Amino acid sequence: MTRLRIDLAYNGAAFHGWAAQPGCRTVQGTVEEALRRITRMPDAGSLRLTVAGRTDAGVHATHQVCHVDVPDQTLGQCVGHMNLTPVQALQTRLSRMMPDDIAIHGISVAPAGFDARFSALERTYVYRIADARVPWDPRLKDFAWRTDRELDIAQMNAAAALTLGLHDFGSFAIANPGGTTIREVKTAYWQRVPTRPLLGPGMGERYHTPAVESGLLCFTIVADAFARNMVRSLVGACVQVGMGKRDVDWFAGKMRVPLREGSTGPIAPQGLTLEHIAYPADDELAARAERIRAKRTL
């Protein structure tokens, strides 16, 4: 049996999230179905992807990582007439079978001890907002949340700073069965993307076209892991602060008392993108997976 690491990206707009669900189009279901066709393993449970970070319906990923265990003989059969290694052949075939909203960026033999979910050191998410400071670009409808209010980025950053460190995010997340909402946030900040005009040499003002993300508000958050709905709920709370509906003291109170209730529900999914998954050195993978499986406490 060979464990393979798969790096991929996807536009989540037309998917019901990552996780396979009967009767729903999902990223996991689409990739697994293609793998079964390539390997001629029709059993639905024969090839199961384990993912670094499950994304909800409408959420995107520019760098997602998963692993799958494939029988050695089955992997060898992927070559067929190709003058490629088995792994290269599988990547080529899988890439060709993907719809336009999924891209396979790489397949490799995973090092010993690698687990896409439990070996990960940290995950990076970015949430994008178009507020009243910038004219609305309809091309962003699937990739940014829109508001006709101008948001106070200084107040939003004051709230975001309170999330740094090890905390119980019970006010902003749902725990998995038997799990907790304790997580360690390493980075959390808001910034406005500078205007980046696409202006070539010798072009006049009429060609002064801003890059598509110019002026957007972006929330970047890095943590060892995230509980369900955690990022979108934190964004939603920061937005309430940025609009002046709530103050930073209210946000601080939610951090102090981890109680889930309606005022800290998740914001719309389309603005959220999983941007990066980081892993330790190969010789630290197994130990990392063992540590992260332990139930966290404060």
Swiss-Prot record:
Return the EC number: 5.4.99.12
List the SUPFAM superfamilies: Pseudouridine synthase
- A single Gene Ontology molecular function, please? RNA binding
Looking up Pfam families in the UniProt record yields: PseudoU_synth_1
GO terms under biological process: tRNA pseudouridine synthesis
Binding positions for substrate? Y125
What InterPro entries does the record point to?
PsdUridine_synth_cat_dom_sf, PsdUridine_synth_TruA, PsdUridine_synth_TruA_a/b_dom, PsdUridine_synth_TruA_C, TruA/RsuA/RluB/E/F_N
What does the record give as the reaction this protein catalyses?
uridine(38/39/40) in tRNA = pseudouridine(38/39/40) in tRNA
The record's CDD domains line, in alphabetical order, gives: PseudoU_synth_EcTruA
The signal peptide stretch is: none
Q: Which UniProt keywords apply?
A: Isomerase, tRNA processing
Q: Which residues form the active site?
A: D56 (nucleophile)
- Tell me the function of this protein: Formation of pseudouridine at positions 38, 39 and 40 in the anticodon stem and loop of transfer RNAs.
Describe the protein's quaternary organization and the partners it interacts with. Answer: Homodimer.
Against HAMAP family, the record matches this protein to: TruA
Family per similarity comment: Belongs to the tRNA pseudouridine synthase TruA family.
This chain belongs to which protein, by name?
tRNA pseudouridine synthase A
Origin organism lineage: Bacteria, Bacillati, Actinomycetota, Actinomycetes, Bifidobacteriales
Gene of origin?
Answer: truA
